[in-house]
Regions:
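C-terminal interaction appendages of subunits in large macromolecular complexes
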Residues: 1-334
Length: 334
């Protein structure tokens, strides 16, 4: 569904949030994006397909409305699930689309290969049988890529070290998930801080500069200390640090906070409680431009996990270099 961004107002971190939308049984809120109704929207699914619609073709509903099934707007299969929404306008500056799968396969493809997509869709990336598309980002061709896993590790490398492939190619190994799965894809174009949030509601900002540059395919460095108390890492985003953050739970609760309220900690720390989930878990996080004239209140009594308890391991021990196995298919069209 579509709704105006001023529907949700800033609250203090650690709050309980408000009801964002009614949900069907076994459904969760996955993504919020900010765009103009006149922009095109590329819709990528877990099966590796891409569809295109206009922003104004998505009906506008109230805050608590369920919206309509995406299958009513695009010709996706009933077994497909939306994994990424990429808005773009005629004057966009993006040159490439960067893909990462749940198992850590990556691909970089020129943006113009996806500009002539209709509502019936086309193949965006080939996938292994046990894999699915996880994230897609638009880039300028010279970005730094950051990929994070559910185990709290992250890898950072230069985008231009990955050669461009055709629309239907499979890709190359980008991140060693080490028994977990990919939970985040970000670029340095989005900000100089890394925001991490765990499923039990702990969050923090860390300086992007704290993440050592490695090569694609590495296991990476610790980006958050994952424990039973914190739960798995569910969000990793690059931010400026002054945006608003919309946090959504599996139970349909939404809270909007200012990232000015989230302190900067070392990359191996766990952070502070940013949402009280109780018997719920965080399902997804969206970043929005800050509300004008929103009041930021310092709350010192919120639970903080002392970063001193979670010392960083030395970089030489923290990083395991990649193997060079590629899994590239031919670029022939399907």
């Amino acid at each position: 569904k579509r709704l105006t961004t001023d529907t949700y107002h800033v609250q203090n971190r650690g709050g309980k949030g408000i009801k964002g939308m009614e949900l069907n049984k076994d459904d969760i809120i996955d993504q919020f994006i900010s765009m103009s109704t006149h922009d095109h929207l590329l819709v990528f699914t877990d099966k590796g397909k891409v569809y295109r619609i206009k922003g104004y073709n998505v009906p506008e509903f109230s805050r608590t409305s369920k919206g309509i099934p995406a299958i009513n707007l695009i010709s996706m299969e009933k077994t497909e699930n939306i994994r990424a929404l990429v808005p773009y306008s005629k004057d966009h500056d993006s040159k490439f689309l960067f893909f990462v799968t749940k198992q850590g396969i990556i691909k970089r493809t020129t943006f113009d290969e996806y500009e002539n997509i209709n509502k019936n869709g086309k193949i965006a990336i080939k996938l292994n049988e046990d894999d699915e598309l996880a994230f897609v980002r638009s880039t300028d061709g010279n970005a730094e890529i950051i990929i994070a896993g559910s185990n709290g590790k992250a890898v950072r490398f230069q985008e231009n070290t990955v050669r461009p492939l055709g629309r239907t190619a499979r890709g190359v190994k980008g991140f060693n998930v080490d028994g977990g799965y990919v939970i985040g894809l970000a670029t340095n174009l989005e900000g100089e801080y890394i925001l991490t949030i765990t499923e039990n509601g702990f969050g923090k900002k860390s300086a992007l500069a704290d993440y050592r540059m490695t090569r694609r395919g590495a296991r990476g460095v610790k980006t958050v200390n994952v424990t039973e108390k914190s739960g798995k890492l569910v969000c990793m985003r690059a931010v400026r640090g002054d945006e608003d953050c919309m946090i959504m739970t599996a139970g349909g609760i939404v809270i909007r906070i200012s990232l000015n309220q989230v302190s900067v900690y070392s990359r191996s720390a766990q952070g502070v409680k940013v949402i009280n989930v109780k018997d719920d878990i965080v399902s997804s996080v969206a970043i929005l431009e800050p509300e004008e004239d929103s009041e930021v209140v310092d709350i010192s009594h919120n639970e903080v996990l002392d970063e001193g308890v979670f010392e960083e391991t030395p970089d030489d021990e923290d990083i395991i270099e990649n193997d060079e196995e590629d899994v590239t298919d031919s670029d022939s069209e399907e």
